[in-house]
Curated annotation (Swiss-Prot):
SUPFAM superfamilies attached to this UniProt entry: Leucine zipper domain
Chain intervals for the UniProt region annotation (Basic motif): 228-251
Biased composition (Basic and acidic residues): 224-240
Lineage: Eukaryota, Viridiplantae, Streptophyta, Embryophyta, Tracheophyta
SMART domains from the UniProt entry: BRLZ
Compartments where located: Nucleus
Gene3D superfamilies from the UniProt entry: 1.20.5.170
An annotated GO cellular component: nucleus
Stretches for region Disordered: 145-243
Protein name: Regulatory protein opaque-2
Length: 453
């Protein structure tokens, strides 16, 4: 059976109410083992019932109280010290708790007589006192281990877990070296308060612990220094400014993109309008080119016609020879040959017209029919009309040529006189007139045919 007794219960008034135990006969006591965990002492006994355990517990507690009273009478009041909880078991849980100030209980080394050693009660008291001294030594060792540098703690983080605490326990080292931890208790208790106060002050929670991510180590808190805090704030401020600059730059780029999109749409509209104008101009250009080619063809045709008329007018003879028919009475009289000239054109046009219609525009000199045309009889009406038309045209051409030949070439001042237009209208039939006009220049003849409807 195991029973757990705390330190507050040991120091409380509970022990004053217990009466001193009655002496009992000596008997074998099982070995008592004490286990220290934080501020709790575990006392276990094996091999006996509940009644024996209670009697043994009362006797042991009474003996321990008597020793404490003797120490209180022989020693002065010790200085206050700070009780630090075990950081290995509850480092992160007890970090926010303030340190508890308690009076340090010092134990004066007492001479253990042979009679006391022989008494099992005294033996139990000695064992309990040794456990208390081991507890204080363990606290001192924890205080010493808390003031090491961060590098040493990072290197030795694995040495404080598992069975490494047994190797680094100073109590066991002292026992192995032959030293008495009881005699060195008072000398070590003097500097315990200062070291514990220093270590506890370094473990006080700080408001900046929330800002430090991942700064908690295995053996305790690694508090940031002022330089690290300042550097962290500077980094945050620079990151904030960088985000502001990026946001402003992104806003400028978005504005530029919107402006470029507007300009692009405007340019696209202008390009569409220009393309439409280009297409219209291209169509108009093709139409104008077709019209120009048509006009060129017409001009060329007019020039060719005028040239042909001029050539025909220049080859007209002064008199048209008419061949006489054969003296056969039965054979019809063949028509006289018509030359390919303007006179022949005029005579062919007026072949079926009435010869009795006169020319009211220009008086022509009457010509008598040559005697060679009337041979062995009279001419037909068609032949007479053709001969009359040819005679009229030939006379008109002779008059125009005579008038043009009598014109002076130049004036008295040496300059060419203005051209004089001379024309001759010849009626070829009841509804047809022809005009031969000369403009005063060499080889510049114009021929017009007018028909009345």
């Amino acid at each position: 059976m195991e029973h757990v007794i705390s330190m507050e219960e040991i120091l409380g008034p509970f022990w004053e109410l217990l009466p001193p135990p009655a002496p009992e006969p000596e008997r074998e006591q099982p070995p008592v083992t004490g286990i220290v965990v934080g501020s709790v002492i575990d006392v276990a006994a094996a091999g006996h019932g509940d009644g024996d355990m209670m009697d043994q517990q009362h006797a042991t507690e009474w003996t321990f109280e008597r020793l404490l009273e003797e120490e209180a009478l022989t020693t002065s009041t010790p200085p206050p010290v700070v009780v630090v909880p075990n950081s290995c078991c509850s480092g992160a849980l007890n970090a926010d708790r303030p340190p508890v100030m308690e009076e340090a209980v010092t134990m004066a080394p007492a001479a253990v007589s042979s009679a006391v050693v022989g008494d099992p009660m005294e033996y139990n008291a000695i064992l309990r006192r040794k456990l208390e001294e081991d507890l204080e030594a363990f606290k001192m060792w924890r205080a010493d281990s808390s003031v090491v540098t961060s590098d040493q703690r990072s290197q030795g983080s694995n040495n404080h877990t598992g069975g490494s605490s047994i190797r680094n326990n100073p109590v066991q080292n002292k026992l192995m070296n032959g030293e008495d931890p009881i005699n060195n208790n008072h000398a070590q208790t003097a500097g315990l308060g200062v070291r514990l106060a220093t270590s506890s002050s370094s473990r006080d929670p700080s408001p900046s612990d929330e800002d430090m991510d991942g700064e908690v180590e295995i053996l305790g808190f690694k508090m940031p220094t002022e330089e690290r805090v300042r550097k962290k704030e500077s980094n945050r401020e620079s990151a904030r400014r960088s985000r502001y600059r990026k946001a402003a730059h992104l806003k400028e780029l978005e504005d530029q993109v919107a402006q470029l999109k507007a300009e692009n749409s405007c340019l696209l509209r202008r390009i569409a309008a220009l393309n439409q104008k280009y297409n219209d101009a291209n169509v108009d250009n093709r139409v104008l080119r077709a019209d120009m080619e048509t006009l060129r063809a017409k001009v060329k045709m007019g020039e060719d016609s005028l040239k042909r008329v001029i050539e025909m007018s220049s080859s007209v003879p002064s008199s048209m020879p008419i061949s006489a028919p054969t003296p056969s009475s039965d054979a019809p009289v063949p028509p006289p040959p018509i030359r390919d000239s303007i006179v022949g054109y005029f005579s062919a046009t007026a072949a079926d017209d009435d010869a009795s219609v006169g020319n009211g525009f220009l008086r022509l000199q009457a010509h008598q029919e040559p005697a060679s045309m009337v041979v062995g009889g009279t001419l037909s009406a068609t032949e007479m009309n053709r001969v009359a038309a040819a005679t009229h045209c030939a006379g008109a051409m002779e008059l125009i040529q005579t008038a043009m030949g009598s014109m002076p070439p130049t004036s008295a001042s040496g300059s060419t006189p203005p051209p004089q237009i001379m024309s001759c209208w010849v009626q070829m039939g009841p509804y047809t007139w022809t005009c031969i006009r000369h403009c005063g220049f060499r080889d510049r003849w114009e021929h017009f045919i007018c028909r009345r409807r």
